[in-house]
Regions:
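Short, functional N-terminal and low-complexity linear motifs
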Residues: 20-26, 104-106, 120-121, 162-163
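Hydrophobic alpha-helical transmembrane segments and adjacent short intramembrane/lumenal linkers
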Residues: 136-244
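A generic structural signal for ordered alpha-helices
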Residues: 9, 18-22, 29-33, 37, ...
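Selected alpha-helical membrane-embedding segments in polytopic membrane proteins
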Residues: 36-147
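Alpha-helical multipass membrane-protein architecture
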Residues: 12-13, 19-20, 58-61, 83-94, ...
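Terminal intrinsically disordered, low-complexity, charge-rich regions
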Residues: 1-50, 56, 60
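A generic structural signal for solvent-exposed, polar alpha-helical segments
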Residues: 10, 49-50, 73, 162-167
Length: 245
């Protein structure tokens, strides 16, 4: 009782509380700087209509005409308001489906064990991390003034799992020939999708009469766009070919 009535103790308690609050705020700011939790929520702001339309664009981009992103007050709108906006819902669901589908395939081939799913998940995540790091490095070397956010890069890189899942499913139902036909279609579709979306991120300054960048910088960005798109079929083949015998 005497301790709590002591002014010095009360002052120390208040100072400690204020220090804890300031430390927590500083830590939250530090975490938010590198891992913007609030911003991540926007990438999951989807609805059924968006998911349906996005899957159509991913699987048949040839009929999609307008690839421009929509903005409101200088900020991109949530995915559910713009089919061209990147999201993390579809890549996440596609990735989880890919892992479960791998388990199903291993089960039908009498190769299933719990460790197999863990190994498959680690392998896929490792390749995704490497891809994201390489794209980030490429964007840095291309000297982009407005580089893409990490969640955005993860979203675009993760869309490939939609095509992978459908290609493996075709292999299960139609055999290896069906797998390669489906993989060819999905790969071509994803190449076009990546070129159309990446050019809006990587080549925005090339439409401004070349004042903002040199010819060599513009060529580097064009090569980067093509390279990102061209490597996708190889990754899709690598991540799925062993699942179809």
């Amino acid at each position: 009782q005497e301790l709590w009535s002591d002014p010095l103790a009360d002052m120390a308690l208040k100072y400690g509380s204020n220090l804890a609050v300031r430390s927590r705020e500083a830590m939250d700011r530090g975490i938010s700087k590198y891992f913007p939790i609030d911003k991540l929520k926007c990438y999951f702001a989807v609805d059924t209509v968006y998911v349906q339309n996005k899957l159509k664009v991913l699987l048949c981009p040839y009929t999609h005409k307008n690839w421009d992103l929509r903005f409101q007050k200088g900020e991109p709108v949530a995915p559910k308001f713009d089919v061209n906006a990147p999201d993390l819902y579809i890549p996440t669901m596609a990735f989880l489906t890919y892992v479960l589908e791998a388990g199903l395939v291993y089960g039908t081939q009498d190769r299933f064990c719990p460790d197999v799913l863990w190994t498959r998940t680690n392998m896929a995540l490792t390749w995704l991390l490497v891809e994201v790091l390489l794209i980030t490095l490429g964007l840095y070397l291309a000297a982009l003034r407005m580089p893409m956010d990490i969640p955005e890069i993860v979203a675009y890189a993760g869309y490939k799992y939609v095509g992978i899942v459908l290609s493996v499913l075709a292999g299960l139902l139609l055999g290896r020939c069906g797998y390669y036909v489906a993989l060819l279609w999905n790969s071509c579709a994803f190449i076009l999708f990546m070129i159309q979306t990446m050019r809006l991120k990587i080549l925005p300054d090339m439409d401004v009469a070349g004042r903002a960048q040199s010819v060599s910088a513009g060529r580097l960005r064009m090569y980067l766009t093509v390279a990102i798109a061209a490597v996708q079929p190889l990754l899709m083949l690598w991540l799925s070919s062993d699942l179809v015998l």
